[in-house]
Amino acid sequence: IMTVNQDTKKILLTTTPRDAYVPIADGGNNQNDKLTHAGIYGVDASIHTLENLYGIDLNYYARLNFTSFLKLIDLLGGVDVYNDQEFTAHTNGKHYPVGNIHLDSEMALGFVRERYSLTNGDGDRGRNQQKVITAIIQKMTSAEALKNYDAIIQGLQDSVQTNMPPETMVSLVNTQLASGGKYTVTN
């Protein structure tokens, strides 16, 4: 969950473990099950499950699959993150050293998917996902990326599912271009 305050330029990322047992909304009839199983009933069931869990309204969603994630990272020219534990990913066999690392799309996908090699498993995976999301936000809100907004949207339009109207996206881009400044991202 990403909570954005445009006035203060602060973003809060909230990660819920995929294996958390929660009442699954809609088709799940509020029976407790793993959060990841909410997706069986569709995007709305996932959204309603999280809304019920946290007592919030989620205005918009963006759904990316692996292909759209790879495209996004490629369109941004990769992302830079700090990796706090060395590991080799089971998914792609790539090695991730401790320290500041640049991730191309394949490396980024392995970084956000890995859990088995990490000390705290899914918890560490969630933190790695937040690191990559933070890096994406920093790149996407930069003047350079905003000026290339059309190319990024064109590159992703067939592979990202969202309920955010295009005019809202344009308004967000224009607001960021006019106000400038970086967002502070916390978890």
Where in this protein do the model-derived segments appear?
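Non-catalytic, solvent-exposed segments at the cell envelope interface
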Residues: M2-N187
